[in-house]
Every structure is written in C-alpha cells, then in structure tokens.
A protein has these predicted regions:
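Bacterial N-terminal signal peptides
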Residues: 8-19
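Beta-propeller-forming repeat regions
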Residues: 21-268
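N-terminal secretory signal peptides that target proteins for export/translocation
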Residues: 1-6
Length: 268
C-alpha cells in the first residue's frame, strides 16, 4: 500500500474536507466543553456496538469515554503514581486505538510519560476502570503512537518515538516499533525494535507509515523540530526497512533547515 498515514486522523480529515466543502456546511457539536487542561488526542469507535460512534480522550488527570450521541462522560482510568516507573501528567500527549488482545474490540493506547494500553472490557460503559498495562516505560518523549503491520505478519504493531536526551533514556534520539507479545495480558512490556537507532535527533514527532520505495516493505517517515532546546532538529526524513525489520533501518533525509517540522504525511 503506497500510502503514508498518521494517527492524527482528525487533522487529516479536516484538512481534506475543508478544501472541498465550505465551512457553512459543517455544524459544530461540542463533545467536551472548554475548561482547564488540554486535549491532545481524540479517537472514535463504536465501543459498545450499539450503532452509535463513541469518543475516547484524556484530560484533567483521567481517560474518559464519551458515549454517543449525547456524549455522557464515563471515566475509565485515573492517572496516579505507582502504575509505572514514571510519574504521569494530567493527560496523554498522544493516543490511538488498537485491538491489542485480538478480542474484537478497540483498546486505548496512550503516551503519558509511559506508553501504556487500557483493555476495553465487555461492557465498556459499566463504570469499572479499564485494566492498565505498560507497553514501554523506557522510551521517553513519546509524542506519537501510530499503528501499522511493520513486519507483515498480519498483526498490527505500534510505532513510537523516543526523543529525550542520553541523560534521560538509553533509547535517546530514536524511533521504535513495538510488537505485541504472545500473551499481552501477562506481559510487563512489549517487544521493542529500534529501527531509527539514535539517528532521529531533535524533537521527533508524528510518524507516517507506508511503502515509500515500492519494494513491498512498509517504511516510516518523521519530522523533528529543533527549537526550544531540541538539538539538531528541523528535518524531514524516512527510514527504509531492510530484509530484517528488527535491525536498524536506513535513513533518507528529505529536507533540512525546516521551520518546526512535525508531520510526515502524504500519498505516493
């Protein structure tokens, strides 16, 4: 599939449709009223399979599920100390959905000082907290989590960046893909593969996933800002997957000296 996409689906959808339809043809519906805190990621799915789309996000120290169409709020997780080695903040910096355990429903994946997943239960709106499990608590500065079948085994993997410095993590200036373990309910972490091994300096951000060179193997693209203390950023690049997806990939620079690049998205 010659397509590069990111989990920033709402941005992509809005950009595409706004160029086609006038603003007057769109009606705004408020799902979460304005208030304290920021919302950095929103995902949609019919979690209870009632035919209505629901929304999940994080804000104000919790992950919340909003049941469509009236958007009643159901907290499903509280960010508290002690669940991971890193103290969480009030909200995820990025998130996405993925059926981690193959049970047919969408689980929540978030990055909040730790990359984690919440298991969607049989009754997601029961009021019972969703089970929290760690994906990776050693990569740091993860501002993007996006899914894709990296090794072409028919199962989705997770792609995440780790832009913190050597004093913070041994996976500094890197981007990884994470393979779901055979027993995800029992595993303490996922299987990490570092494909951009210390050659993604600066503040790497949202990744694109697709077969750039048409060799049948999916590649990964990213951009990195270089302001606000991020050293050697301001670039766009893509990494070419080799025959062994678990080994470091070959980096190809697309552009340098770019002003605050963060997204790599397009159709080839």
């Amino acid at each position: 599939m010659n397509l590069i996409s990111t989990s920033s689906i709402f941005t992509g959808i809005l950009m595409g449709f706004v160029s086609y339809l006038s603003a007057a043809e769109w009606k705004k519906h408020t799902v979460v009223p304005a208030g304290k805190g920021s919302i950095n990621g929103v995902s949609a799915s019919d979690f209870d399979e009632d035919g209505q789309v629901d929304v999940i996000t994080s804000v104000g120290g919790e992950v919340i599920l909003l049941k469509g169409p009236d958007w009643k709020r159901f907290p499903v997780h509280q960010f508290v100390k002690g669940l991971a080695r890193n103290k969480p903040r009030l909200a995820c910096i990025h998130s996405c959905l993925m059926d981690v355990d193959g049970d047919g429903d969408m689980d929540f994946i978030g990055s909040n000082q730790t990359v984690f997943w919440l298991e969607c239960p049989d009754n997601p709106f029961s009021g019972t907290p969703w089970k929290y499990r760690t994906v990776d608590d050693e990569i740091l500065g993860t501002h993007c989590v996006v899914t894709g079948d990296v090794n072409r085994d028919g199962k989705l993997d997770l792609i995440a960046n780790s832009f913190r410095d050597p004093n913070s993590t041994r996976f500094y200036n890197s981007i990884v893909w994470l393979e779901v373990p055979k027993k995800p309910h029992e595993a303490t972490s996922w299987i990490r593969h570092v494909f951009a091994d210390k050659d993604a300096p600066g503040g790497s951000h949202y990744m694109g996933f697709g077969d750039v060179n048409g060799d049948g193997r999916p590649d990964i693209a990213s951009g990195a800002k270089g302001t606000q203390g991020f050293v050697r950023g301001q670039w766009f690049a893509w990494w070419e997957q080799g025959e062994d997806a678990t080994k470091p990939w070959k980096k190809h620079l697309l552009a340098t000296d770019e002003e605050t690049p963060s997204n790599a998205i397009g159709k080839l």
